[in-house]
């Protein structure tokens, strides 16, 4: 089996961030009737879109030689694990905002962010921006989820088209 390269690392990272964006787009469709939830899901969707742009920009700055270097096997394992996530499958099973919150929380604490942080540290050229990027890209998501309030309120906000 050929060794994974940096080009594959970036391709799979972009695929994972795109799946996360699709998940938040789906949450926006399901909970857009609630302004508070809609604001959070739109911000999260926008962030995932920004992650894709960031990854594309960093990849574009790498030389062809760098792109053909071997990728970190542990990061590739984590990415392949993340890519098992199916936004459509999860969205079909959501009944209320509390369900959505828990899946979003799980996604934000998954290996997708570990890989993004790895890429920021390994491939982003400007060290002064690294800490800012990690805070902006990763920690802001967790803070946004807190805006969705407590579990009792989240359970009271039903999805537009709950299953069943």
Question: Model-predicted segments: where are they?
Answer:
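Non-heme di-metal
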Residues: 1-164
């Amino acid at each position: 089996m050929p060794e994974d390269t940096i080009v594959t690392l970036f391709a799979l990272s972009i695929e994972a961030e795109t799946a996360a964006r699709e998940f938040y787009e789906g949450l926006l469709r399901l909970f857009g009737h609630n302004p508070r939830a809609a604001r959070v899901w739109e911000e999260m969707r926008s962030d995932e879109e920004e992650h894709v742009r960031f990854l594309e920009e960093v990849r574009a700055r790498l030389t062809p030689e760098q792109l053909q270097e071997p990728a970190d096997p542990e990061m590739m394992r984590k990415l392949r694990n993340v890519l098992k996530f199916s936004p459509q499958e999860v969205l079909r099973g959501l009944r209320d905002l509390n369900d959505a919150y828990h899946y979003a929380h799980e996604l934000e604490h998954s290996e997708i962010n570990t890989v993004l942080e790895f890429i920021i540290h390994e491939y982003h050229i400007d060290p002064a921006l690294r800490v800012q990027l990690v805070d902006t890209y990763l920690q802001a998501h967790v803070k946004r989820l807190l805006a969705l309030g407590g579990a009792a309120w989240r359970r009271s906000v039903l999805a537009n088209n709950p299953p069943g």
